Curated annotation (Swiss-Prot):
Enzyme Commission numbers on file: 2.5.1.54
Pathway(s) served: Metabolic intermediate biosynthesis; chorismate biosynthesis; chorismate from D-erythrose 4-phosphate and phosphoenolpyruvate: step 1/7
Origin species: Mycobacterium tuberculosis (strain ATCC 25618 / H37Rv)
Name this polypeptide is given: Phospho-2-dehydro-3-deoxyheptonate aldolase AroG
Gene Ontology CC: cytosol; peptidoglycan-based cell wall; plasma membrane
Amino acid sequence: MNWTVDIPIDQLPSLPPLPTDLRTRLDAALAKPAAQQPTWPADQALAMRTVLESVPPVTVPSEIVRLQEQLAQVAKGEAFLLQGGDCAETFMDNTEPHIRGNVRALLQMAVVLTYGASMPVVKVARIAGQYAKPRSADIDALGLRSYRGDMINGFAPDAAAREHDPSRLVRAYANASAAMNLVRALTSSGLASLHLVHDWNREFVRTSPAGARYEALATEIDRGLRFMSACGVADRNLQTAEIYASHEALVLDYERAMLRLSDGDDGEPQLFDLSAHTVWIGERTRQIDGAHIAFAQVIANPVGVKLGPNMTPELAVEYVERLDPHNKPGRLTLVSRMGNHKVRDLLPPIVEKVQATGHQVIWQCDPMHGNTHESSTGFKTRHFDRIVDEVQGFFEVHRALGTHPGGIHVEITGENVTECLGGAQDISETDLAGRYETACDPRLNTQQSLELAFLVAEMLRD
């Protein structure tokens, strides 16, 4: 398989050689044990990596540097981080309506949070690369190889479709590039207009069963916008927005193929993972001596690490020391995913231990993954109340310790799916079958996402 030109793989342009020290560090990282990797032929994977090494990147270093600057504000308590999007992107749903819907949902949430926090909101989407998922078992209930995301195999319950296919690496890149191109176009051509986004939010308040609760906040935002209009404020920032791309750095054949060399802030050559602006290491692949953490050490992108209920304060400190050796504010985001019943007990000693190191990390709450259960009707689901409660517990911990609750990381969609229970729509277990469309884990629908944003805005104002 080739990219878009009829050139044999062995004639594609090669990347310039890395400086010796970077080459040594990268090789050492990739030689470590790597969990959750596809089992495909090494020679075919090498051929696909060669293709990806010759293509234009999905992002560019200057955008990553700009994101790093904004994340430094979050780490210092001067901004808030909103990260959200599909649990797993699919090639089939990589369409203009779906991407537009997700971008719109993220923008709607961001407007509410910006007003509630009275500070900038850094917007990061789970988009343009979230095509792979770790799984708890290699074989599913049908006796087939588990679906691991479109980057690795197909979703259809068919043995041939479930084979691990390295040519999907190139398909993932093509879809990611197209998605990122559309995101840039949408956010610079009117969709991100503050007045338009607020009008959508007013519609939510008008039609939602819980709208009355949020009417006061929406009216305040409305008054603020009218005041700016009366003053003749017509700044470009009111018409556009920056949305950065993120995904879990899971499939190392993909991540390593998208590495590019560029000069850093200090003029020294650095390796940027240009498959995204920022990546995170998941709960199942964050082995302290594994390849994923070592890979994250090598790249210049800001990175995140998921912290589940088994995390210890001592291990959290070790992640901080390895991934943020130069104490760069916002370089590292620690994403707690404890579950609503555990966050109030487990998070405080971790925060205290990390804060004592003097590192300025971002504390972010993932209220989704610790609150997943199977419904009586057989669907994997999450209850809206538990999601809200984990965010509330996260805020309570940080308020008590005097630290900054820096952000939330949520799985959302701009479509009216029925995957998570509860919320103002009061989705029940019998409703789940109506529009249960996720390729992996359940997502908050548009109304639930915006309802969560209004509730978090209230927390930010308290």
